[in-house]
């Protein structure tokens, strides 16, 4: 009897320890994993081999392959890298044989569209008419079927909001006064027409895809104004789910002169922050306009945004941080100015004793969000010559878990993790591979 009780207690303990990392197949919440195929070609430790992707596939319910292009001369879907995609498409979709729970989609658009953000291309496509759009749809079905994708993800690069501008107190008063007479700045004067055209296009696309036994999803990219382009109540039913990229509200490129939380859960109503620069606002907008919460997935980034500090930025560096100097230097892995992958951030935080480290090698100080509302940041003040200063806004694995709890509280359908290649897929920081992915899965 004692032996039997011991065995039962061991089983219970084992189940409890494993509960934090439930495989995707055992959980009805979605975990959408974005895979940037270009990471397959990155040099050194940045190269994401198929073996790493297999580790992630256990935890993901859906995998989104990024990215395909829109050829606006032929009105067809096309490859951004034919030499890679001609074999890599099927290499990735073949993962379904080993992971039968996994559904794999091809995404069109994203932020990799031939290296520049060409919103005009998508506007021209919406204006092109049904015949040319049908040409695109036929080409998409052919490409998806030929390579065994389960569906298409629309990540159209539509025009974005103008970035928040830095104003003095007098400047803010003048802006409010001026707005009385001029109104808001108009990014797209034909937004109402484009909204109608997008609604008609996705309706036609969804009907055709259903007949072809293909799924359709949508990704709302950062700073794309949903009010302008998405008739929420009319379009949501055309999609299996909708991913809201509720991060990068501020970036060093869009906001070079000030640093702030890039993906807060809630609004910190001070320092003249904009009311829509937070997750809660974005989710509420879609739900309040008719989209069921279970159709939505919350986008969580596995990277941080990094600003270069000046001497005038001060030494406390509490956000909002003024007098910043745009993007910080790129990391060795990500190689993008103003962006640091989680292992790159973790390596800067790992130095517990700063003695002997100076300049760019000096440690950064992490400031943890004890309120669990806004996010973490880390910084190193600049010297008197405006050198070596850095300020980073990021979600570590713990805060990604906090955001996942928000998803559960709000009855949201799941999480869209962007991007697997910026998580610590080699386990360089703590020895655990994909710590952010694992944290999200453990909290779903």
Swiss-Prot record:
Where in or outside the cell?
Secreted
Entry keyword Disulfide bond = yes
Listed A to Z, the keywords are:
Developmental protein, Disulfide bond, Glycoprotein, Secreted, Signal
UniProt signal peptide: 1-20
Free-text description of this protein's post-translational modifications in UniProt: Glycosylated.
Q: Where is the GH18 domain?
A: 29-444
Glycan attachment positions? 213, 225, 335
Q: List the disulfide bonds.
A: 33-60, 346-429
One Pfam family recorded for the sequence = Glyco_hydro_18
- List other remarks: Lacks the typical Glu active site in position 157 that is replaced by a Lys residue, preventing the hydrolase activity. Its precise function remains unclear.
Give the family from UniProt. Answer: Belongs to the glycosyl hydrolase 18 family. IDGF subfamily.
Protein purpose? Cooperates with insulin-like peptides to stimulate the proliferation, polarization and motility of imaginal disk cells. May act by stabilizing the binding of insulin-like peptides to its receptor through a simultaneous interaction with both molecules to form a multiprotein signaling complex.
This chain's protein is named Chitinase-like protein Idgf1
Q: Which organism is it from?
A: Glossina morsitans morsitans
Q: Which gene encodes it?
A: Idgf1
């Amino acid at each position: 009897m004692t032996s039997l009780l011991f065995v039962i207690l061991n089983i219970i303990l084992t189940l409890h320890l494993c509960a934090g990392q439930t495989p995707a197949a055992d959980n009805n919440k979605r975990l959408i994993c974005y895979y940037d195929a270009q990471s397959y070609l990155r040099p050194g430790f940045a190269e994401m081999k198929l073996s790493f992707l297999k580790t992630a596939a256990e935890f993901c319910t859906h995998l989104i392959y990024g990215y395909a292009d829109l050829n606006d001369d032929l009105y067809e879907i096309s490859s951004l890298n034919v030499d890679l995609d001609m074999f890599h498409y099927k290499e990735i979709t073949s993962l379904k044989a080993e992971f039968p729970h996994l559904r794999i989609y091809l995404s069109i658009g994203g932020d990799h569209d031939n290296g520049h953000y060409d919103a005009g291309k998508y506007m021209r496509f919406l204006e092109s008419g049904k015949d040319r759009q049908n040409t695109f749809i036929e080409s998409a079905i052919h490409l998806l079927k030929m390579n065994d994708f389960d569906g298409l993800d629309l990540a159209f690069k539509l025009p974005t909001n103008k970035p928040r501008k830095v104003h003095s107190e007098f400047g803010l008063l003048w802006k409010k006064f001026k707005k009385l007479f001029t109104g808001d700045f108009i990014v797209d004067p034909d937004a109402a027409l484009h909204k109608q055209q997008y609604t008609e296009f996705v309706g036609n696309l969804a009907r055709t895809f259903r007949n072809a036994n293909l799924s359709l999803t949508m990704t709302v990219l950062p700073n794309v104004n949903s009010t302008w382009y998405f008739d929420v109540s009319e379009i949501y039913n055309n999609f299996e789910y909708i991913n809201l990229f509720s991060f990068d509200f501020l970036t060093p490129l869009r906001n070079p002169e000030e640093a702030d939380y890039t993906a807060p859960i809630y609004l910190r109503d001070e320092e003249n922050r904009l009311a829509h620069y937070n997750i809660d606002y974005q989710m509420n907008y879609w739900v309040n306009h008719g989209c069921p919460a279970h159709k939505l997935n919350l986008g969580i980034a596995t990277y941080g945004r990094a600003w270069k500090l000046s001497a005038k930025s001060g030494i406390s560096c509490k956000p909002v941080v003024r007098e910043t100097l745009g993007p910080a230097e790129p990391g060795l892995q990500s190689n993008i100015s103003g962006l640091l992958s989680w292992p790159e951030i973790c390596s800067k935080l790992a130095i517990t004793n700063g003695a002997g480290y100076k300049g760019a090698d000096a440690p950064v100080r992490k400031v943890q969000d004890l309120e669990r509302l806004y996010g973490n940041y880390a910084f190193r003040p600049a010297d008197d010559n405006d050198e070596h200063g850095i300020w980073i806004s990021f979600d570590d694995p713990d805060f990604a878990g906090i955001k996942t709890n928000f998803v559960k509280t709000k009855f949201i359908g799941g999480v869209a993790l962007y991007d697997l290649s910026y998580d610590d897929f080699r386990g360089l920081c703590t020895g655990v591979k994909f710590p952010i992915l694992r944290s999200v899965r453990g909290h779903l």
